Amino acid sequence: MTSTSIPQLLVAAGSSGSGKTTFTLGLLRALKRRGLAVQSFKCGPDYIDPKFHQLSSGRPSINLDLFMMSPEHVRAVYARHTQEADAVVLEGVMGLYDGYVRMHGSSAEVAKTVGIPTVLLVDARSSAYSVGALLYGFKHFRQDTEVVGVVFNRVASENHYRFLREAAEDAGVIPLGYIPKTKLLEVPSRHLGLSLRELQELDALPEDVAALIEKHVDVDRLLEACMRPRPAVPIEEAVPTSAPGRKIAVARDEAFNFIYEENIRALTAQGEVSFFSPLKDEALPECDLLYLPGGYPEFYLSELAAAERSRSSIAAYAAAGGRVLAECGGMMYLCRAIRDEEGKAYPMCGVLDQEATMEGMRLRLGYRKLRLGGREYRGHEFHYSSIVPQEVGEETVGEQLTARDEVAPTLLYRRGNVLAGYTHLYFAEQDPFALFS
């Protein structure tokens, strides 16, 4: 497509568990099979769904989050990544209007910010004509939300779909088709360390869903209903840089891969970015800043413990006063050891006088505001591990708040020029070196 207008849509639902991710993966693959270059986005801070998106579309997927990002930045990122696309699919998070406070930061607000319509995915199990009231409510709850169509999921039969189609028509929402009820179309658990091999094995899922979409969904009508002008790329403010020309090393492999592409873009503005793999026992490259992102170190404890060259080079760099920003799994890697679910300890870098453990796993999650050195940074927390309290350990710095400005129990540890904590930061609009000033 070379037109100034391209199909652009938000895939949203009434709640989590409705099948948004599964449908999105199938739609991305169906459009790719038509020869379209389709750009995907994900509402919210999630790292995992974008990996599924890339598997389905063949293109990197980008997060859009109105808690961590300014509206101007959201629009700029969206526009920049859609310039070479023939179609755009944005997957929502939770329910359409669910935000961190009321609907602030919701999928609906993101769609409004970038100016695209919404296609609802409705779980139709045990539903019939009464679904029309639900659709009418979603369409009219907010006048600035454009709900143009609906796809029904988990539909029992053509006769079942007839009731649903009539309900949608009477609610003023275009019925675009349905996905039949089947147990085969399930995305794996949210807490999985997906290797490249496992991702490739998952490739059958988008293929299967794409086949169902082509058979039961009017894709042409969907694309036509969502045709909108391609956004012009605004003039973006330059990423703040305190001293350009620096060297930044980023750990990136199967153990450490929770990375926002826009953060890498911000780091590139600071200087030269190089990547290395602790899992492959690669030594830390020469750098002025080491970025250890989150990921799944708990799935590779034996390999990381055996990677002595990588561990010792990081420990030596930190001991010499090198700057380190470590998030979640990256922080765990800096600890003396990580204990698995059975309590077995595996030696790690020993930069922090702490132990991380997977024992008694309990999910901790939420948005975070980090206030440090007179500045505010934003991010989110999502982890099952915990830090074993130590009598003597690192100092804790800064203050962390929830999205509702309540004090969060999340800690940021500091030792020399090492900053480590559970919060995954989004710093694409800020100078990451300012964290150390």
Task: State where each predicted segment sits.
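ATP-dependent carboxylate-amine ligase catalytic core
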Residues: 2-114, 122-148, 158-162
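A short helix->loop->beta-strand "cap" motif at the edges of active sites that frequently abuts
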Residues: 116, 173, 319-323
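Internal gly/pro-rich beta-alpha loop/helix module
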Residues: 129-240
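Residues that mark the start of a beta-strand
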Residues: 8, 36-39, 245-247, 272, ...
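Phosphate-binding active sites in nucleotide-utilizing proteins
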Residues: 244-308, 312-319
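Structural motif
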Residues: 10, 89-91, 119, 151, ...
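C-terminal and late-domain segments of enzyme folds
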Residues: 111, 242-244, 256-266, 358-437
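Cysteine-nucleophile active-site neighborhood
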Residues: 297-371
